[in-house]
């Protein structure tokens, strides 16, 4: 009797706990099970080129799905449906076991059989559509629809998937999408995204403009039963807000042509090389309008097929890209930091003229080599070191390039000439520009500062100075470091875009325009919301940007606080030197490019430019044992603009391991310029 009484007491206490003490908790749980929040998918914005060519869009993707609650109750009938569906969509009826710890189900990615997915979904949310196979073709989708009566519980859902019509030609600009990664799931949920389904930008414009392109999902708050079936709306649904569209400054016609020209040139030389070490592996072409900073083309090679990453990111393909030493996922145009070679002589020339290190008419002797005493500090007795001109690299031209004035020193790209301007040389050039002033002019012309272009992962580049070398490498600055930096070698690095900006600034007489790759932001109906106006960083002939250094200070590169501008005539003389490179120098008679820039001259389009051959010794060259003193491998550079009197396009070409700028990079630039003016003429004929 006592035991029975005790049992009643325990029961009464438990009932009291359930009905009174735990009432609120149980009601909260019941409410959570009864009320559900559903996301209404938005439409991602479209990306266009400047002429409305579609570069990124949404297209329908067809997924074969099952709704477990609608499948026949009879297991035999289910199996027959699964068997017939399996034959149509090439997915096994039975495969694997779904286990949240070891083999979880992930829509569109899991390798599980139809029966396993159906059983898992039936125990999870039987009224929720679950993909069996994603991205089936339209014909297969229609056949499934036709069998709707025979296959209850089997259907097709249509979901948007990203499509990139221009593929490899623009993938380094446009980028691609990927799943929301765990670190930002909560943040993205707060913005209305569904981490189980929605994707975000992983690279390029897709990443940089995620907030504008992504839009915002709508929401429905609904009452559901225990199986997940929607019973009713609890409030008026909030409509989805579509993403904004973006119109770029890129002209896809020029972009595609520049890509083809670069690949053609690389393949041409690779077919003729004698050793594997001479293979050219990657390159960049960028074209810009120097008047407003609009980027007309930006090619980074090798590229990748972003359409292969549109539905899911295949592990094998992504691993292949990530393991590739040429880094195809990297936009080399803005992220590569490489030695720039003789294109940097533009900077040294501007600085030397403005600081009166040399006059334009002054004659400088340029033998095949000069011997300098390399010193690390004021009283250092130094060590003799030879500095060789490019024409005497193999010792066959000890006479060098002769006696040169400034115009021809730049046109012929004499190393010895610019060694003397940068570091000084005996009584001929008593006081060289020096590394402090050289760095100041480089920064003024766009080096060592990431350009404000609307792309991710834009690199800084490096203009070294004594403090940097002491802190970073634990070494003192030497006079030899200054000589080498004066010709863009040694520790000087930059991105191809920075090199292009320096030349574009000179072409415009000192106006440095910030580069832009975005022209307009539009709403989903095509109405312009924002137009990106040209942005002048500074006019170097008006805005004082060059620091004046305290020559009495014990510290290196100590500024006085005063700034000065660059005289307009300086840019005109540098322009004349770049023009002479085409008519007399490394882009003309000294070039191996036939017919060369004469093609443009014949059409009444005078051009100006500068070549560069940049020796390098990176981890890849070191691993191959190629960093032999005096025989380092080299990158190829050329930058040019046209027409000379009123520039409307400037182009840079960079070829990794390209050996020589005049032979390899110059023809690329010339052909891109030709293509631009042919497109322009064609548009004029059509009245555009």
PLM region descriptions:
Residues 78, 202, 247, 251, ...:
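Short, charged, low-complexity patches
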Residues 1-240, 252, 263-284, 290, ...:
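Membrane-proximal periplasmic segments of bacterial cell-envelope enzymes
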Residues 56, 62, 224-237, 241, ...:
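Beta-lactam-recognizing serine transpeptidase/beta-lactamase-like catalytic domain environment
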Residues 71, 255, 337, 658-659:
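Short strand->helix junction
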Residues 682-688:
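Short, flexible loop/turn segments with low-complexity composition
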Residues 507, 582, 670-681:
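Short amphipathic alpha-helical signal-transduction/dimerization elements
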């Amino acid at each position: 009797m006592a035991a029975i009484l005790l049992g009643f007491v325990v029961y009464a206490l438990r009932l009291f706990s359930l009905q009174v003490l735990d009432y609120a908790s149980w009601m909260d749980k019941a409410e959570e099970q009864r009320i559900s929040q559903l996301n209404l998918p938005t439409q991602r914005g479209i990306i266009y080129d400047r002429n409305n060519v579609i570069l990124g869009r949404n297209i329908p993707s067809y997924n074969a799905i099952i709704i477990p609650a609608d499948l026949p109750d009879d297991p035999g009938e289910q199996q027959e449906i699964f068997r017939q569906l399996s034959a149509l969509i090439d997915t096994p009826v039975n495969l694997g076991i779904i286990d949240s710890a070891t083999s979880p189900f992930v829509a569109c990615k899991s390798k599980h059989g139809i029966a396993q997915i159906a059983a898992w979904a039936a125990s999870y949310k039987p009224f929720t559509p679950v993909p069996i196979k994603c991205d089936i073709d339209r014909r297969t989708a229609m056949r499934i629809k036709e069998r709707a009566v025979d296959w209850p519980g089997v259907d097709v859902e249509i979901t948007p998937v990203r499509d990139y019509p221009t593929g490899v030609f623009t993938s380094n600009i446009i980028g691609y999408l990927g799943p929301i990664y765990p670190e930002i799931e909560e943040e993205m949920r707060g913005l209305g995204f569904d981490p189980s389904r929605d994707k975000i930008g992983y690279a390029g414009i897709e990443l940089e403009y995620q907030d504008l392109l992504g839009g915002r999902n709508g929401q429905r708050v609904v009452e559901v039963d225990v199986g997940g079936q929607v019973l009713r709306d609890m409030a008026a649904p909030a409509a989805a807000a579509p993403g904004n569209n973006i119109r770029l400054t890129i002209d896809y016609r020029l972009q595609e042509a520049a890509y083809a020209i670069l690949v053609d040139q690389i393949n041409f030389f690779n077919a003729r090389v004698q050793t594997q070490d001479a293979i050219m592996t990657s390159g960049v072409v960028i074209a810009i309008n120097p008047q407003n900073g609009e980027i007309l083309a930006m090619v980074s090679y090798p590229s990748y097929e972003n359409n292969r990453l549109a539905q899911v990111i295949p592990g094998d393909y992504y691993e292949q890209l990530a393991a590739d030493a040429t880094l195809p996922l990297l936009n080399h145009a803005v992220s590569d930091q490489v030695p720039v070679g003789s294109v940097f002589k533009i900077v040294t020339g501007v600085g030397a003229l403005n600081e009166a290190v040399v006059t334009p008419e002054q004659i400088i002797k340029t033998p095949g080599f000069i011997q300098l005493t390399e010193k690390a500090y004021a009283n250092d007795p130094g060590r003799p070191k030879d500095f060789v001109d490019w024409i005497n690299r193999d010792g066959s031209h000890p006479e060098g390039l002769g006696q040169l004035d400034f115009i021809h020193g730049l046109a012929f790209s004499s190393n010895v000439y610019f060694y003397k301007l940068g570091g000084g040389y005996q009584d001929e050039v008593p006081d060289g520009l020096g590394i402090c002033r050289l760095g100041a002019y480089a920064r003024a012309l766009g080096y060592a500062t990431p350009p404000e272009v609307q792309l991710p992962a834009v690199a800084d580049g490096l203009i070294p100075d004594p403090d940097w070398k002491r802190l970073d490498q634990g070494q003192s600055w030497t006079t030899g470091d200054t000589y080498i930096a004066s010709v863009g070698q040694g520790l000087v690095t930059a991105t191809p875009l920075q090199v292009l900006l320096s030349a574009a600034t000179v072409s415009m007489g000192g106006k440095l325009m910030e580069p832009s790759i975005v022209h307009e932001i539009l709403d989903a109906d095509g109405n312009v919301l924002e137009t990106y106006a040209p942005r002048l960083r500074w006019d170097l002939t008006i805005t004082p940007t060059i620091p004046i250094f305290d020559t009495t200070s014990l510290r290196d590169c100590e500024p006085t606080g005063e700034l000065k501008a660059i005289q307009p005539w300086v840019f005109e003389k540098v322009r004349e030197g770049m023009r002479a490179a085409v008519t007399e120098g490394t882009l003309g008679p000294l070039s191996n490019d036939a017919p060369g820039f004469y093609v443009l001259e014949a059409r009444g389009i005078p051009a100006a430019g500068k070549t560069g051959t940049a020796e390098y010794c990176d981890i890849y060259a070191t691993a191959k044992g190629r960093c032999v003193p005096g025989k380092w491998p080299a990158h190829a550079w050329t930058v040019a603009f046209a027409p000379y009197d009123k520039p409307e396009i400037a182009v840079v070409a960079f070829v990794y391991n390209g050996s020589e700028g005049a032979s390899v990079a110059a023809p690329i630039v010339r052909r891109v310029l030709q293509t631009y003016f042919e497109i322009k003429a064609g548009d004029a004929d059509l009245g555009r």
